[in-house]
């Protein structure tokens, strides 16, 4: 009985100090929540973000192929509709973990 009483505080500390499963679970992170999570995960290393490049690609997709480009694309109509795989698609539209966010650290 005395051994049990000595181990009880240790068991309680371990029980209450385990990480919350929600904190480690995959989550939707959008906007400022995504930025805060990146700061948390990356710390002093920082993270990379290239919005201008993304806008250039999106603009090309909106405009579609030019008239002189249509000849080479007759059998490839989805050629210019590329799938995006950025951090917003990965963590906001879908879910991601803190471990996946680490891929965006410098």
From Swiss-Prot:
Disulfide bonds join 30-92, 42-105, 91-96. CDD domains: IlGF_insulin_like. Pfam families: Insulin (PF00049). InterPro entries: Insulin (IPR004825), Insulin-like (IPR016179), Insulin-like_sf (IPR036438), Insulin_CS (IPR022353), Insulin_family (IPR022352). One of its GO terms (cellular component) is extracellular space. Belongs to the insulin family. PANTHER family: INSULIN (PTHR11454:SF9), INSULIN/INSULIN GROWTH FACTOR (PTHR11454). The keyword Isomerase does not apply. This is Insulin-2. Insulin decreases blood glucose concentration. It increases cell permeability to monosaccharides, amino acids and fatty acids. It accelerates glycolysis, the pentose phosphate cycle, and glycogen synthesis in liver. Heterodimer of a B chain and an A chain linked by two disulfide bonds. It is found in: Secreted. It comes from Xenopus laevis (African clawed frog). The gene is ins-b. The keyword DNA repair does not apply. Gene3D superfamilies: Insulin-like. One of its GO terms (biological process) is glucose metabolic process. Residues 1-23 form the signal peptide. SUPFAM superfamilies: Insulin-like (SSF56994). Residues 56-83 form a propeptide. Keywords: Carbohydrate metabolism, Cleavage on pair of basic residues, Disulfide bond, Glucose metabolism, Hormone, Secreted, Signal. GO terms for molecular function: hormone activity. It comes from the Eukaryota. SMART domains: IlGF (SM00078).
